[in-house]
Amino acid sequence: MDLKFKVHFALVLLFLAHFGESQTGVFDITKYGANSNADISEALLNAFKEACQSTSPSTIVIPKGTFTMNQVKLEGPCKSPLELQIQATLKAPSDPSQLKVGEWLTVNKLDQFTMSGGGILDGQAAAAWECKQSKKCNKLPNNLSFNSLTNSTIKDITTLDSKSFHVNVNQCKNLTFIRFNVSAPANSPNTDGIHVSRSSSVNITDSNFSTGDDCISVGDETEQLYITRVTCGPGHGISVGSLGGNPDEKPVVGVFVRNCTFTNTDNGVRIKTWPASHPGVVNDVHFEDIIVQNVSNPVVIDQVYCPFNKCNKDLPSQVKISKVSFQNIKGTSRTQDAVSLLRSKGVPCEGIEVGDIDITYSGKEGPAKSSCENIKPSLKGKQNPPVCTASAASSS
């Protein structure tokens, strides 16, 4: 092998090595100037800009450590699948005045996006919650916002102490959350775990929620939402709604909550609509194989939802609820009201089914009871307490 050929061969190997390295598509933000003593926002944006242009799958790595990060928006479309691997603890500015109205970390318009890594997004919200309680601050940012994602996965991520919602999901399709964790104190205001709206085929599975508001809340135009093997508590339970508060809300169709456990929550499984509401539709909603442990209001349909008592309760909700089932719900209630089904006088409920309910209450007031208004569900199996019958302890 002559010298010229050896040199040529060596150059080819160097090219292939460089090409192979680029094809692995790993973009470590520390290579873009990120360090633990400064805001990593610019480094993350620069890494994303390059990764987004890659024609082969790429991974942005935020390595282990603790970093500060201001508001960041990662916006596609990108040329190939992209993974954001958060191994670190990311801390938001604690002073709410340092943040503009919007979200802390936003991911928009991506296909085949993955967020992973076992990291923590810490909203550092104590000062913001105090500000919110005093009503002296602007709208506070959510920790995470996912908009117009398709065929994407969020896994092994924790969101901690968000200033508002932990996660907002909007206009997404085929999005999965797995081993996703939400953590905030029970008294943290408006800290819904995941809020889903205008999205279809969203899966939330094997995940844990401890927060100050709904663990999972469902907004309008949600279709085919699957919630499986989720733990909730503290928090306000899993809620479809509140609905009917805005004009032109689209139907909620296909919500399936299965094999979930609620512990020390203010509610269990719930559908809630405003009185004097705009028209709306809730259809094909099923709560099955649910365990409640010391839960206030374990089973609820509330069409007179008015948390701040600033509603016209004389006018009925115009949200039509149909094809809803509560099946195999067992455990203990913190209040005597184990089952509460309050239907609107304005539009009839249809196809409401209650089966195999066994919820006990051990307070001095007496055993658990149900309350029913303007509703006559189909009953299957056993119900303890009796539901919507003459033998119910409280029924109207």
Swiss-Prot record:
Keywords for the protein's UniProt record, in alphabetical order: Cell wall, Cell wall biogenesis/degradation, Disulfide bond, Glycoprotein, Glycosidase, Hydrolase, Repeat, Secreted, Signal
Q: Please give the catalytic activity noted in the UniProt record.
A: (1,4-alpha-D-galacturonosyl)n+m + H2O = (1,4-alpha-D-galacturonosyl)n + (1,4-alpha-D-galacturonosyl)m
Q: Which residues are glycosylated?
A: 143, 151, 174, 181, 203, 208, 259, 294
Q: Cell wall biogenesis/degradation: present as a keyword of the record?
A: yes
What are the GO BP annotations of this UniProt entry?
carbohydrate metabolic process; cell wall organization
Q: Where along the chain is the active site annotated? A: 213, 236
Q: Which domain of life does the protein's organism represent?
A: Eukaryota
What general EC class does the enzyme of this chain belong to? hydrolase
Q: Which InterPro entries match?
A: Glyco_hydro_28, PbH1, Pectin_lyas_fold, Pectin_lyase_fold/virulence
Q: What is its EC number?
A: 3.2.1.15
Q: So which tissues is this one expressed in? A: Pollen.
What PROSITE patterns does the record point to?
POLYGALACTURONASE (PS00502)
| MF terms (GO), sorted A to Z | polygalacturonase activity
Q: Where in the cell is it found?
A: Secreted; Secreted, Cell wall
Purpose: May function in depolymerizing pectin during pollen development, germination, and tube growth.
Q: Which family does it belong to?
A: Belongs to the glycosyl hydrolase 28 family.
Query: Which PANTHER family does the protein's record reference?
Result: PTHR31375
| Name recorded for this polypeptide | Polygalacturonase
| Species this chain originates from | Nicotiana tabacum
Name of the gene encoding the protein in the UniProt record: PG1
